[in-house]
UniProtKB/Swiss-Prot annotation:
Transmembrane segments: none
Organism listed in the record: Shewanella sp. (strain MR-4)
Keyword annotations of the record: Acyltransferase, Cytoplasm, Transferase
Task performed by this protein: Functions in the N-end rule pathway of protein degradation where it conjugates Leu from its aminoacyl-tRNA to the N-termini of proteins containing an N-terminal aspartate or glutamate.
Family that this chain belongs to: Belongs to the R-transferase family. Bpt subfamily.
Protein name stated in the entry: Aspartate/glutamate leucyltransferase
Length: 238
């Protein structure tokens, strides 16, 4: 693959086959890019063909017998919150939010609590600072943090990549004690708001996996587009 910006070839490798972390009984294999020459412009283009970031590595599923992972994005100029999403925004009007590039101990403490209480049965448990940094941070693209506060108390964080044409939602976490606030939904809505304020065309949400309940919520944000073999297509779901 060539970067249009520099015409420098980009090497794409393929991982070994290993058990899928999302679907029981399935096997996973990834196309992986780990290049020092990556930059936000090129990554924006890679997002548009289905790649995703984890740390400094860029990957895309290429599983031997499964195609359940569907790249999904929101066209920001067309996105309209549903009635339920509007209620979530209204219910959280007492909270404040801010954008920062600063990585803080409070962010990590909240992440640790979230993983210990919500994902103690998953591959990210037990949490550690080194795992957190390797998963979320990238040497060629500074992360953007959307922080949500109740007074001075940090309630939720969305880690987001800011790119020339889009935002990419990397990971979100929140205080499990505040489940009634639907903070996960609020963080997606705030990322949509930020994308609109920054005049971005898309918010990339990663992969939609219908067969995994924890990964199927992304279809609730409409209209959305799914990457198919024919290109990006709007959902037919009303």
């Amino acid at each position: 693959m060539n970067s249009n910006a520099s015409n420098t070839p980009i090497a794409i490798g393929i991982s070994q086959i290993f058990p899928c972390s999302y679907l029981d009984g399935q096997q996973e294999q990834l196309l992986v890019i780990q290049e020092e020459t990556l930059d936000p412009i090129l990554f924006d283009r890679l997002l548009a063909i289905g790649f995703r970031r984890s740390g400094s590595a860029i990957y895309k599923p290429r599983c031997p017998r499964c195609s359940a992972c569907q790249p999904i994005r929101l066209p920001i100029k067309e996105f309209t919150p549903s009635k339920r999403q509007k209620r979530t925004l209204a219910h959280n009007r007492d909270l404040t939010w801010r954008i920062t590039s600063e990585h803080t101990e409070a962010q990590y403490a909240l992440y640790e609590k979230y993983i210990r209480e919500r994902h103690f049965d998953g591959p990210m448990f037990p949490p550690s600072k080194s795992q957190y940094e390797q998963f979320l941070f990238c040497h060629w693209l500074p992360a953007t943090f959307i922080e949500v506060y109740d007074g001075n108390r940090l309630l939720a964080v969305a880690v987001t990549d800011t790119l020339p044409n889009s935002l990419s939602a990397i990971y979100s976490y929140f205080d499990p004690d505040e489940e009634r606030r639907s903070l996960g939904s609020l963080l997606i809505l705030l990322q949509c708001r930020l994308a609109k304020l920054q005049d971005k065309e898309f918010l990339y949400l990663g992969y939609q996996i219908d067969a995994n309940r924890k990964m199927s919520y992304k279809r609730l944000y409409r209209p959305y587009q799914i990457l198919t073999p024919q290109g990006w297509e709007y959902s037919q779901v009303c």
